[in-house]
């Protein structure tokens, strides 16, 4: 999965897919009542990027829906996975459940079109704080109440705070999550970070006793870091330059071992070579 980083305006969806992304990441900010408000990152952000692209949250999922609904003029077949980077740092811990409820209602209406030929992409809810695990409960229970439990087949999870892997596992146990787990690791491209925790996550994924199904590393903009990430065995790479990742995947050393994921590849299944 080549994951386009910080895709916060509708126009950027196309821009990143054209560069080779089959997945995008979008920042979601919340208002004081725990409603998703904007797709917005703000300053500071990654080096070399404009941090200020944004949409109202109600509008972004509609644009995303068009890009991921077969038959729509804006449809982009390659775009199969979307990570919502939920900026819950502005919320109190006790608002996490409400945030999940409100996010579910919003996506149900504006992205899934109330279950009537909505967008087809898989969605990862990425939460920065383990204490906000109730967001997952709020999201799931809302879709069930609204009669759309089937859509949970399209929803996965990530805790993005670079916490110790056993602590992440505990948070999932509290939330009742038993699958559909992506594990991120990384840091802004302005700083360096080694791959030691990525390797621990990959080891869990491949242990046969795993709670992690997929591992992705962010933010990777250089060919050398891309090669190191692939050598470590990641499933996804989040990047500001999807074309760089696509180029490296075409190198002789990687061409036979890796390919770009398609819609038929289940993002919740651990890959077994």
From Swiss-Prot:
The active site is at residues 5, 41. Its cofactor is Mg(2+). GO terms for molecular function: lyase activity; metal ion binding; phosphoric diester hydrolase activity; toxin activity. Its EC number is 4.6.1.-. One of its GO terms (biological process) is killing of cells of another organism. Mg(2+) binds at residues 25, 27, 85. It is found in: Secreted. Keywords: Cytolysis, Dermonecrotic toxin, Disulfide bond, Hemolysis, Lipid degradation, Lipid metabolism, Lyase, Magnesium, Metal-binding, Secreted, Toxin. Belongs to the arthropod phospholipase D family. Class II subfamily. This is Dermonecrotic toxin LruSicTox-alphaIC1a.
